[in-house]
Amino acid sequence: MVKDVSPDEVAAEMSKRKLLFVDCWAPWCNPCLALAPILDELDQKYADNEDVGFLKVNTQIHVQFAIDNNITGIPCVLLYVDGKPAQIEIEAEGNAEPFTLDRLIGLRPAEHYEFIISKVMGTETD
């Protein structure tokens, strides 16, 4: 199960992981509640991988964390790589310009998180 932590615990964990997912959620948010089992399953899957971690921060309790991280909607999963906010380059389809990703917003399937993990860990397949 993904551990619900304080912002201080997020800061401490960032330096320990190559890739850290931080789920910004609130107990009244139905999409947040629907995302929880997806992240719990991924957390279990990667439990033995010290490079990948999952945490969650209750934005109803830790309002300043949400403000500091420009959280304007939830669920919002912040991405940290090597202890810093992520800057993951994503190739867009068609003629669209590539873009940089630092968070996943909304209810997303496990495959989206798996894609980020493979991209950051260098295990992408074409």
Regions found by a protein language model. Give the residues of each.
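Short cysteine clusters
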Residues: 29-32
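N-terminal "domain-start" segment that seeds a small globular fold
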Residues: 1-12, 113
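Beta-strand cores of modular interaction/reader domains in eukaryotic scaffold and signaling proteins
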Residues: 20, 53, 76-80
